[in-house]
């Protein structure tokens, strides 16, 4: 049996060595123990020395080199001897390769492609929106220029009409109606500017979804027609009168209230302004002025139509008497006399049925006009509330106030 001896550095024998000493060796992180074998011949009483088998020693060396018997901390990892030529891979990379490596799903790839397509489309839409925003101020400026030009043309046309008409004052409502009509006519007859020519041509081939613009234009045209229908009907009547009579009163069967008188430019005789006594329910107004050609003829201009019947005290007998009285006068030589005679003949030829039908149509037209007037309801409510407050018993009966 081999005997373990201390290393030669501790004790050096003085006699020739009779032992074979094998120092400890380090092989890849492991140590082998030191061994000493005796080389001197054995005594007859001692057992024979062991025979050293070098194949057994090589087997032990290979067994010691196994990684499973090493004492380092790289448990289960590849041996460092086998990876000595290549650099060691980090542990994070090995963990990611073992646990985080998975195959991409086809649905995920499809979603990524869809997201990329949507982002590209959003970029294109953003560019288009920026272009539209950049072009908007230019188009707005063109529209403003067109509107200002149309307004200036309308104002000029209104001034020209007021200067060429008969020299009386015009009410603000008539001025507003004229300005609106002139604006509509200017917008209707205005030539389209070059940026809007293509839009007008494309409107002819518009799809059903684009018919809203056409319907809006039709609605505007209908409103214009309704506004023209709502204009007060203007009629004139010529009556003989005494030149010395300065009252300018024309008896037509209705009651009137005079609210003004002024001298016009084209006629030295003054013009009187009357309003129906049923106002504001009845919107009819009357202007009376002597003719510039003949002082014996009064020209009565009526604006609108009465929405009520004549007062009851004005009967048919007075009408016939007045007609006979007018017929006794000699007709004036001017053109107004012919008009007066024509009106008298038409009134004599018209029967009672025609007058009733005319009154019925007049009532229907006035009712339609009042229902379309936004201020009619407010005026009616104000009048009724004032009348109710006047007739309220709390203001007249003190006994009710004590209660």
Curated annotation (Swiss-Prot):
Induction: Induced by biotic elicitors (e.g. fungal chitin oligosaccharide). Accumulates in response to M.oryzae. Disulfide bonds: none annotated. Keywords: Coiled coil, DNA-binding, Nucleus, Plant defense, Repressor, Transcription, Transcription regulation. Residues 162-172 have a biased composition (Low complexity). Residues 306-317 have a biased composition (Basic and acidic residues). GO terms for biological process: defense response; negative regulation of DNA-templated transcription; regulation of antifungal innate immune response; response to chitin; response to fungus. The WRKY domain is required to bind DNA. Transcription repressor. Interacts specifically with the W box (5'-(T)TGAC[CT]-3'), a frequently occurring elicitor-responsive cis-acting element. Regulates, probably indirectly, the activation of defense-related genes during defense response. Modulates plant innate immunity against X.oryzae pv. oryzae (Xoo). Negatively regulates the basal defense responses to the compatible fungus M.oryzae. This is WRKY transcription factor WRKY28. It comes from Oryza sativa subsp. indica (Rice).
């Amino acid at each position: 049996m081999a005997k373990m001896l201390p290393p030669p550095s501790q004790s050096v024998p003085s006699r020739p060595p009779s032992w074979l000493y094998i120092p400890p060796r380090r092989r890849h992180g492991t140590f082998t123990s030191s061994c000493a074998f005796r080389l001197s011949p054995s005594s007859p009483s001692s057992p024979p020395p062991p025979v050293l088998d070098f194949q057994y020693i090589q087997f032990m060396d290979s067994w010691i080199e196994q990684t499973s018997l090493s004492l380092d901390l790289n448990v289960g990892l590849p041996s460092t001897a086998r990876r000595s030529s290549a650099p060691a891979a980090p542990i994070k990379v090995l963990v990611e390769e073992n646990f985080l490596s998975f195959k991409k799903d086809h649905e995920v790839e499809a979603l990524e492609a869809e997201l990329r397509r949507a982002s590209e489309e959003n970029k294109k839409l953003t560019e288009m929106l920026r272009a539209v925003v950049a072009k908007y101020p230019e188009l707005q400026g063109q529209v403003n220029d067109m509107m200002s030009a149309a307004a200036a043309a309308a104002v000029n046309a209104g001034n020209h009409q007021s200067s060429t008409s008969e020299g009386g004052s015009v009410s603000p409502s008539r001025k507003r109606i004229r300005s609106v009509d002139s604006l509509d006519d200017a917008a209707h007859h205005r030539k389209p500017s070059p940026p809007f020519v293509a839009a007008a041509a494309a409107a002819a081939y518009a799809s059903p979804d684009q018919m809203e613009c056409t319907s809006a234009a039709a609605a505007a045209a209908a409103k214009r027609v309704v506004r023209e229908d709502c204009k007060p009907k203007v009629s004139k009547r010529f009556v003989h009168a005494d030149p010395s009579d300065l009252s300018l009163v024309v008896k037509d069967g209705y009651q009137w209230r005079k609210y003004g008188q002024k001298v016009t430019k084209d006629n030295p005789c003054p013009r009187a302004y009357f309003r129906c006594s049923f106002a504001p329910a009845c919107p009819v107004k009357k202007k009376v002025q002597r003719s510039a050609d003949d002082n014996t003829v009064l020209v009565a201009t009526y604006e609108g139509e009465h929405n009520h019947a004549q007062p009851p005290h004005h009967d048919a007998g007075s009408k016939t008497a007045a007609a006979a009285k007018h017929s006794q006068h000699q007709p004036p030589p001017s053109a107004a006399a012919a008009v007066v005679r024509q009106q008298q003949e038409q009134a004599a030829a018209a029967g009672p049925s025609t007058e009733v039908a005319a009154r019925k149509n007049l009532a229907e037209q006035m009712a339609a006009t009042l229902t379309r007037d936004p201020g009619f309801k407010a005026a009616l409510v104000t009048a009724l509330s004032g009348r109710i407050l006047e007739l309220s018993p709390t203001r007249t009966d003190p006994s009710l106030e004590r209660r």
